[in-house]
C-alpha cells in the first residue's frame, strides 16, 4: 500500500494519485499510451477538465508527454523526471526498486563531504552550535532523524551554494521516511552520535579533515542500510 491512499483527496489530487499509481504498478508502463480523455475520465470518475488539469501538471513533472491530436504517452520517469519527483516517490515507497535507496545514499555520499568542507570553512561557529547538541540528543529514532536532517540542510546552507540547498530540500520527504527506518537501528544511532562528536572535535581543531570524516561515515551508512534491508528479507 502507498503512503497516501487512505487520505481524502481533492478531485485533481485524486486523479494524480490514480495516474501515478497506475504507472508505478505497471497498468500504464513507460512507453505505452493513456486511453482517450473521455474514456480515462470515465474510468477514474472525474470530469474531463479535472483530468486535463492533472495531466498537464504531471506532464510538467516528467510523467507524460502530451501532443495535440495524439495519445498521451507515458515517459520513463527515471529518465525524464526531475529532482522534484523524489518528494512524490517518497509517498509511493512500496513501488520503489530495492536498490533505489542505495542509489540515493550514494548520491548523498558524493555531495555531502564537499558540502561539509565548505560549511566548516564558511560558518564554523554556526556548525559547532548545532553539533554541540549531539552531546545531549535523546536515544530515539525520530529525534535522531530530525537532528540528522537539520545538520545536513544546515551544512548545505552554510556552504553558501544555493543549489545545494535546493537539491537537499527535494530530499526532505524521502529522508523523513527513510531516516525513521534507519535510526531504528541502535548501531545507526551509535554510529551517528560518534560521527557528530568527531565532526565537532575536528572543526574545533580547524576542520581540515572534515571531508574525510563525512565521506567515511556516508559510506558506513550505506553498509548499515544494506544490513537493515538484509535483515528484512
Task: Show which residues each predicted segment covers.
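Short linear motifs at protein or domain termini
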Residues: 1-110
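Short, flexible helix-adjacent loops and helix caps
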Residues: 24, 28, 93-94, 116, ...
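Short, hydrophobic secondary-structure boundary micro-motifs
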Residues: 31-32, 128, 164-168, 211-212
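Short loop-to-helix capping motifs
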Residues: 36-37, 160-162, 205-206
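All-alpha effector-binding/dimerization core of bacterial HTH-type transcriptional repressors
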Residues: 79-150, 154, 194-216
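Hydrophobic, amphipathic alpha-helical faces that serve as interaction scaffolds
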Residues: 107-123, 147-188, 221-226
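C-terminal all-alpha effector/ligand-binding and dimerization domain
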Residues: 135-136, 169-233
Amino acid at each position: 500500500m502507498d503512503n497516501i491512499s487512505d487520505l481524502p483527496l481533492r478531485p485533481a489530487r485524486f486523479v494524480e494519485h490514480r495516474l501515478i499509481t497506475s504507472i508505478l504498478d505497471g497498468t500504464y508502463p513507460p512507453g505505452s499510451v493513456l486511453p482517450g480523455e473521455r474514456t480515462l475520465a470515465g474510468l477514474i470518475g472525474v470530469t474531463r477538465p479535472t483530468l486535463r488539469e492533472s495531466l498537464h501538471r504531471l506532464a510538467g513533472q516528467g510523467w507524460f508527454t502530451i501532443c495535440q491530436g495524439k495519445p498521451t504517452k507515458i515517459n520513463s520517469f527515471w529518465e525524464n523526471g526531475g529532482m522534484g519527483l523524489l518528494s512524490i516517490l517518497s509517498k509511493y515507497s512500496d513501488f520503489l526498486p530495492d536498490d533505489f535507496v542505495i542509489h540515493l545514499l550514494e548520491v548523498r555520499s558524493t555531495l555531502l563531504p564537499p558540502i561539509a568542507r565548505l560549511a566548516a570553512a564558511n560558518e564554523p561557529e554556526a556548525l559547532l552550535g548545532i553539533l554541540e547538541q549531539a552531546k545531549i540528543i535523546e536515544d530515539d529514532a525520530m529525534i535522531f532523524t530530525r537532528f540528522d536532517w537539520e545538520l545536513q540542510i544546515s551544512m548545505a546552507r552554510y556552504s553558501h551554494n544555493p543549489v545545494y540547498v535546493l537539491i537537499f530540500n527535494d530530499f526532505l520527504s524521502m529522508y523523513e521516511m527513510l531516516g525513521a527506518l534507519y535510526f531504528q537501528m541502535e548501531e545507526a544511532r551509535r554510529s551517528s552520535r560518534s560521527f557528530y562528536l568527531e565532526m565537532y572535535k575536528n572543526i574545533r581543531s580547524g576542520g581540515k579533515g572534515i571531508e574525510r570524516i563525512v565521506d567515511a561515515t556516508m559510506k558506513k551508512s550505506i553498509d548499515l542500510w544494506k544490513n537493515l534491508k538484509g535483515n528484512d528479507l
